């Protein structure tokens, strides 16, 4: 039997998603918890591997099991075995041809900035702090230059292992909600550090250091060295993964659950 789970986690204390020796990873914690409940070794596949410090409210995984358990075992039971900063949001039996990564048609991220002169306290690790005043409207207009299927070489990490730099950004918006500036971006898939590199460049537009047309120039250059610095991991959330409707997966609120602007 193949089961899909919706996963939420706070990435501050993990060295990213992927299982690694001698360091904490989200994958390791989930596989350990699932193996206990299933009473056999479980390996999981995810929709998108997040970097160290990156969070998720809409991660999706799948695993195969021979265990006959009530569905509550895969939600309440797993949550009882997990640390407080990782949680299962839903569970759903899926066809054997479902794959958390390869069946996905889109991923959506939100990047949340606390834009005030002084740093926050309560949400210090849940948002990115940027003290220079930001013009969200200018950032939003600049971001529209990135829409569509394009070569995003200028926004990929040097260590990116993707075979192609082409990605299709379906939607991108930047707006202000009080003290917060929020980037909301959806694409068929993302290159390594792509969202953080886009945000790092949009910040320079937001401060007025660069004109909004500069974003298009970066894209055309196909050169990572001409774009802005990589934005911090704090404040980045994988909030949604889209699948064909016939899989019938639940669609909870996007999150972060404390911030649904």
Swiss-Prot record:
**What Enzyme Commission number does this protein have?**
5.4.99.12
Put simply, this protein is called tRNA pseudouridine synthase A
Q: Which organism is it from?
A: Tolumonas auensis (strain DSM 9187 / NBRC 110442 / TA 4)
| Positions annotated to bind substrate | 109
Taxonomic superkingdom: Bacteria
Substrates-to-products reaction catalysed:
uridine(38/39/40) in tRNA = pseudouridine(38/39/40) in tRNA
Query: Which GO MF term does the entry hold, naming one?
Result: RNA binding
- Please provide the record's keywords in A-Z order: Isomerase, tRNA processing
- Active site annotation, chain numbering: 51
Indicate the quaternary assembly: Homodimer.
Broad enzyme group: isomerase
CDD domains, A to Z: PseudoU_synth_EcTruA
Q: Give the family, as the similarity comment puts it.
A: Belongs to the tRNA pseudouridine synthase TruA family.
What Gene3D superfamilies does its record include? Pseudouridine synthase I, catalytic domain, C-terminal subdomain, Pseudouridine synthase I, catalytic domain, N-terminal subdomain
From which residue to which does the signal peptide run? none
Task: Please name the GO terms of the biological process aspect recorded for this protein, alphabetically.
Answer: tRNA pseudouridine synthesis
InterPro entries from the UniProt entry:
PsdUridine_synth_cat_dom_sf, PsdUridine_synth_TruA, PsdUridine_synth_TruA_a/b_dom, PsdUridine_synth_TruA_C, TruA/RsuA/RluB/E/F_N
* SUPFAM superfamilies tied to this protein: Pseudouridine synthase
* Functional description taken from the UniProt entry: Formation of pseudouridine at positions 38, 39 and 40 in the anticodon stem and loop of transfer RNAs.
Q: Which HAMAP family match?
A: TruA
């Amino acid at each position: 039997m193949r089961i899909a789970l919706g996963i939420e986690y706070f990435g501050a204390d993990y060295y990213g998603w992927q299982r690694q020796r001698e360091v904490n990873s989200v994958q390791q914690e989930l596989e350990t918890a699932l193996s206990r409940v299933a009473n056999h070794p479980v390996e999981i596949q995810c929709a998108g591997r997040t970097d160290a410090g990156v969070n998720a409210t809409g991660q999706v995984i799948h695993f195969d099991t021979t265990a006959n358990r009530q569905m509550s075992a895969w939600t309440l039971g797993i949550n009882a075995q997990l640390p407080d900063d990782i949680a299962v949001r839903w569970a759903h039996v899926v066809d054997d041809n479902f794959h958390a990564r390869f069946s996905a048609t889109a991923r959506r991220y939100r990047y949340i900035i606390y834009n005030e002169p002084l740093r926050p306290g309560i949400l210090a690790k849940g948002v990115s702090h940027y003290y220079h005043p930001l013009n969200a409207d200018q950032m939003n207009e600049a971001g529209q230059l990135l829409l569509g299927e394009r070569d995003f070489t200028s926004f990929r990490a040097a260590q990116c292992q993707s075979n192609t730099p082409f990605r299709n950004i379906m939607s991108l918006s930047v707006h202000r909600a009080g003290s917060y500036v929020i980037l909301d971006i959806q694409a068929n898939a993302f290159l390594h550090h792509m969202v953080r590199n886009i945000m790092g460049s949009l910040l320079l537009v937001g401060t007025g250091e660069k004109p909004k047309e500069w974003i298009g120039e970066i894209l055309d250059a196909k050169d990572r060295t001409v774009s802005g610095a990589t934005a911090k991991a704090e404040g980045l959330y994988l909030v949604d993964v889209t699948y064909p409707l016939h899989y019938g997966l639940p669609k909870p609120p996007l999150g972060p659950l404390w911030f649904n602007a």
